[in-house]
Every structure is written in structure tokens, then in C-alpha cells.
């Protein structure tokens, strides 16, 4: 039977997706693009993050640490953001941290402290995925940050379900070339990959903690979504290794959480197509062909498998694959005099409002950012990605074995949804500590939860790829439970 290489097959799928273009490339699109276009290693390397020879340099020398940075911290404090609402009762900071002084590589951050008891609450680092997408544009201004952008592209409104209600939250644009992060050596943009991103993010953290020394001993958590299913575990692993090597730069890592995360190619690809079928986006006939002829653990697919996967994309049609029940953006023009509010019906044109806001000169000045043609995602970073393990499961196992709390959550209306998390988790064969049950947020079932030894899996009802955008209250309930170390409530508070 004729065989088609994995790479050729994925390119064919990618060309089919162009038939149904999105109005604007988003984080979810970038993940899809990356999955369909990347070259897996041949033979695929399944070594854990800790075992690869190429990673020796990651742990072989102390990180670059700048001198004391109190003056920089004071300079990074934001006086006010243009268009922000009245009554802001928390401190916010933003600016650059140098991660490589020789090449002039600097990463941009935005930090919001909690409005109450910030001196005792934990520190949470948020990372968006892609690869190549901004944690400022998505995480901070569209998902879990304290503000969202009105449809006028000029003003902000408060998010009552912001995660800084329960933690001090740090948003990082990484790697260089994304958002406001940059390098004076442009060839750096062609070298981005999992290894360099983990290393730069670690160096960023060490230096950021020098700038904010009051957080050095604070409980520290990392959370992220999408391709951050790679970033977050890899950064956590890097921290653990360096904590053992260098006692003067200890980071008090307690746990990680992964949302709608891509962590294992073979099981996640199967989960993707199963999810499309169970949500009635694919026909029985196409799904049966994929089930029979597609072995996602192999490098080469048969022509029948390739054609079936292509047909799956055609059958799905022009919908938002990452919230399959949501409308598309049909009018991206800015609206004057609009005032938004946070609900479970996210405006599908929100990307455009954020882009307009973050490109305003007065906004970039207030954020202490260099003048930049800012965008949510970088095409060059995504398409030039240098290294990406086909599985992160060994790294996840390493973190569990080292006592790091680990939650994985999935919105159930995302095509990259529940099955792409369940299938990889099942391969770990962890004992169940707490059986599958519903959990509540307010008076409604927020989703379902199952507890394993060392890992908790949570679904979020009615949420797409960006869980805090589509179900902000449920996302806050979830992250609060994660930080407090308890499972979400099993009964409604009204009962």
C-alpha cells in the first residue's frame, strides 16, 4: 500500500485548512498550524526533558544574574493604563528583563499584584502557547488578567474573575520575537525552540526575582495553556534541576497547571479526531477510516489515512475549532462609546480590540514598552521552531515523582479538548485517589474532576480553548482550588 510521510501528510492537511481561513491567526490557529507542519524527529526522540544530551548546557552553568534591580522595579511601576476604569486598587508593573546581555535579548513582562493581602498570596506565572503567541494579549487582556479591552480598542473594563483575586500574577511574553519581547540579534528569532525557551524563561525568573526580592521565598506556581503544555513542564523541570545545582537561586516551585494542553503527539492526535467525531463534526465513515488506517505512533501514514484526515477537516467546515459552538468574528471594526462586561459569551472579535489597544503609542509608553508593531502571534517564531519533543509525558512523570502538584484541565467545547488530555493521562497508569464526579461553581456544575496519585484532571463545562475567556467564574473557582490544594466543591453552595 502506498505510504505518505508524516510531514507530507501534515502539509496536505494544512493546505486544506486554508480553504476555510480564519479572520485572523490566533493562538489556537498557531497550535493547529504547528501540529500540522512540524517535522517530528526521525526516529522520534522520546527521551525525557532531563535525559537529552543537548540539554546539558541548560544545567551546566549558573544563569546570568544582573546586579540588584530596585531602581528598575521602581521604574517599571505603571502609574495608570490609558482607558483603565476608576477604582483600581492594586499595583501593576511592566518592563523588560535581560536574559542574554551579549545578544541583547530581553523579555517583556506584565505583573499585577493582588488587591488584598498581596504580601502573603502566592506568585503565579502565566504562559500562553502557540508556539509564538503572547501572554499579554491573550492571558492578561483577554483571559485571566484584571482588565479586558472594550470594543472601541481604547478603553478597558474590569474583570471581576481575574486571577489576581487569589494570587499575584506574572505574565511573560516568551520567547524573544513575541509581542514586545525582542533581541538586538535578529538571528535569535530563527533559533527558538523548546530548549531555548525554557532556558530564557528560567533566566528571566531568576532576574525578575532580583527585581522583586519580596517574592523570592513565596510559593510559586506556573500555569499555561495550549502549547504551554510543553513550556510549563519544561520550565518546571529546569527549575528543579537548577534548585539542586545552585543554592543561591532557589525558586520555591509548588505546582503547575495545564489548560487544553498539547503534551503527547500520538495520543493527542487520536484524541483530536475522536473529539471531532463525538461532537458530530465528522461522519461515521470518515471516523471509521481514521480508526482503521491511522497509527499515530508511526512516522508514515497510509494514503487512506491521509485522505481520511483531510476529509475530517473538510467535513468540520468553517467553524471556530477551538470553541465549536461559538460564532465567528464577522465585523472586526472598532465601535465607539462601547462599554463591556465579563460574561460567558466572549466577543469573537476580541483579538482585534486587544491588537488596537496594545498598538496605541500612549499604551506602549505606559507599559514601558519599546515602540512595536505588536501582534498576538508571530508567524516567524511558529514556523521556525527548532525542537519539540513528541511527548512531554516523561517530564510530567518526573515532576510527579518530585512532589510537584500537577493539575490538567480542559474546556469541553474545544476541538483540542477533553480527549487530548484524557488519553495521555491514561498512559501514565496512575492510581485513582478520587473517583470521577461533578464539581460546582456557584449554583451550576462547573465540570467534572478525577484525582489521581500526583495529578488532578478537571473538565470545564462550556469552555473552549481559552478557558478563562469563555468560563471566567469557573476558571477562577478552578485555579483557587488548585492553589488551595483542594478539589473543587462536590455540591452547590446553595444546597
From Swiss-Prot:
| Alphabetized GO MF terms | serine-type carboxypeptidase activity
Q: What is its EC number?
A: 3.4.16.-
Give me the segments passing through the membrane. none
Locations listed in the record: Secreted; Secreted, Extracellular space, Apoplast
Domain of life, per lineage: Eukaryota
Q: Which residues are glycosylated?
A: 117, 184, 300, 310, 336, 373
Predominant location = secreted
* UniProt keyword Disulfide bond, yes or no: yes
| UniProt source species | Medicago truncatula (Barrel medic)
What is the protein named?
A: Serine carboxypeptidase 1
- Active site: which residues? 226, 414, 465
Q: Which UniProt keywords apply?
A: Apoplast, Carboxypeptidase, Disulfide bond, Glycoprotein, Hydrolase, Protease, Secreted, Signal
Which family does the record assign? Belongs to the peptidase S10 family.
| Assembly with partners or alone | Interacts with KPI106 and KPI111.
* Record's keyword annotation contains ATP-binding: no
